[in-house]
Each structure stands twice: as C-alpha cells, then as structure tokens.
Amino acid sequence: MKFVMYPHLWESTTAVIEGGGHERVEDIKDADFIFFNGSAPEFPDLPENIKFVQASMAGIDALVKRGVVNEKARWANAAGLYADTVAESTIGLILAQMHMHATTRLAKSWSVRPEVENNKSWLHDNKTVAILGAGGIGVRLLEMLKPFNVKTIAVNNSGRPVEGADETFAMDKAEHVWAEADVFVLILPLTDATYQIVNAETLGKMKPSAVVVNVGRGPLINTDDLVDALNNGTIAGAALDVTDPEPLPDSHPLWEMDNVVITPHTANTNERIRALTGELTLRNIELFEAGEQMATEVDVVAGY
C-alpha cells in the first residue's frame, strides 16, 4: 500500500513500514492511507482515496473533538502499544507522591525531614488502588502492582472482569469506589461521559488520605476543583502527567504545591512512539488488506 506520513517525517518509522513492502509518497492524493503523527489542528482534509488513518497516539479524542473523525475512512490508534512505558511511569508517579518527593524538592532543606517522616505513606501498607480505564495500560499496571500486595479495583464500561484485578465494576456501578480506594489512577479515554469525572463531588467522596494520579487525559479532572481539594485537605495529593490546560502555565498554582508531583506528559516519549508504531502499522495493514478489523481499530461512533 502507498502511504503518506503527516505532518512529521519519522525516518525510523518510515523505514519499518517500507521494509514491509509499502511505499511512502509525498502527495496525500496518491496514498492509500495516512500515518498521522501531529496535533489535532494539523490534521489535513482527507481525500476519498484514503482508506484508513493510522494515528500515532493512544487516543484520538482530540481529533474527535475537532470533528475530523468520520466513517468515510477507517481509523486506528496506538492503544495498548505504550502499556509498558506508561505503566512504569505510573508506578513512579504513585511512589513519588506517596513518598513526598515534591515536599523535599520545594523545601530545598533537610529540615523538612520530620514532616516527611510523619506523613509519608507506603504503597505496600494495605492500600487499595482503583484503576479507571483498565485497558492495555491498566492490565500492565496491575501486573506491576502485584509485588506491592495492594488490593486492586478495575473500572471499565462493561464491568467485564479485568485480568489481574481483585474486583471489576462497570462505570455506572462504581459509585462506591470513590470512598474505598487510596489511590485513583485515571487512564480513561476522554469522552462526554468521562469529561471532568474527577470534580468537587467525586473528590469530596474520597478519603482525606487519597491520591489522584492522571496518566490519561488532562480534562478527566476539573483542575480548579482539584486545586481546591488539595488546598483544603479534601485529599492528600495528586500526581499528574497530563493536565488541563496543557501545557500547564508556569504560573499555575499546581507547580507550587508540595503535595503534587507533575511530569510534562512524558509517561511515554516520542522515542518510544517512533520505535513501536512502525510494527503496529504493518500489523494493521495486514489485517486491513485481509478485510478484518485492525488490531487497534477505533469505533468512530464511540470515539475510541
């Protein structure tokens, strides 16, 4: 098949796809599919010759919001491809927050040691971790959590049991989880139903010792409500790889909070994305040409 890579030329990824017998072309009108690796505003108008879109990102909610996702072409994302990297980063965020790394960093002084000793918490100490959005990343995270002997709760749309989770609940039957878990990990796709799912109401149901970790999408959290909850002690802390707004402005109060750990959307990196998406694209091409559902095909109605 002929493909166009847009808007950025990733030579290593291109080499993998071409190594599978496919040809990169410059003009989208000559292509059978597009490998898209940009931001939503950069997405081009699709001519009728484009049969499918391979996106390099795990979720295409930004493209859905922009209104460019439709049934004129088939769509595939990179869901689950970054399970190892994002799950490992999530473990790092959880531990950094519970071990109060931000408190020490902001204090810039050894004198903070008594405060850390008195308030530091331990993941292995009878904790319950709720994973909201237990897809490929969530399943890998469950595996990585096993050595900590935590109780795990998976929350998904269907309520179908998630491998490795102690309990699984459908989203509409998980109201009790807000009061039960010690750590909440958000890996949900961004939809109308999940937009600002963490807000003043749900934060108010959490334990004062609860920690919120977001490696999914920034708008899963109402940021103003989170700031209020962190300031008034409604919850203990947050660890954020994604934020709303993003990038988070340098002057934003979250940067100065000693109960918040922030990483700049680096739970997965471009280097890893480029290394992995070529092989995924080859697999999806093979399935597409066989008339089968692609490995990471998106339901364009649901948006994920």
Curated annotation (Swiss-Prot):
Signal sequence coordinates: none
Keyword Membrane carried by entry: no
Catalytic center residues: R217, E246, H265
UniProt keywords, alphabetically: NAD, Oxidoreductase
EC number from the UniProt entry: 1.-.-.-
Entry annotated with the keyword NAD: yes
PANTHER family recorded: 2-HACID_DH_C DOMAIN-CONTAINING PROTEIN, D-ISOMER SPECIFIC 2-HYDROXYACID DEHYDROGENASE NAD-BINDING DOMAIN-CONTAINING PROTEIN
Name of the protein in question: Uncharacterized protein Cgl2355/cg2587
Protein family: Belongs to the D-isomer specific 2-hydroxyacid dehydrogenase family.
PROSITE patterns the UniProt entry points to: D_2_HYDROXYACID_DH_2, D_2_HYDROXYACID_DH_3
Amino acids binding NAD(+): G136, I137, V215, G216, R217, D241, H265, T266, A267, N268
Pfam families for the chain: 2-Hacid_dh_C
Gene3D superfamilies in the cross-refs: NAD(P)-binding Rossmann-like Domain
Organism: Corynebacterium glutamicum (strain ATCC 13032 / DSM 20300 / JCM 1318 / BCRC 11384 / CCUG 27702 / LMG 3730 / NBRC 12168 / NCIMB 10025 / NRRL B-2784 / 534)
MF terms (GO), sorted A to Z: NAD binding; oxidoreductase activity, acting on the CH-OH group of donors, NAD or NADP as acceptor
Disulfide bridges in this chain: none
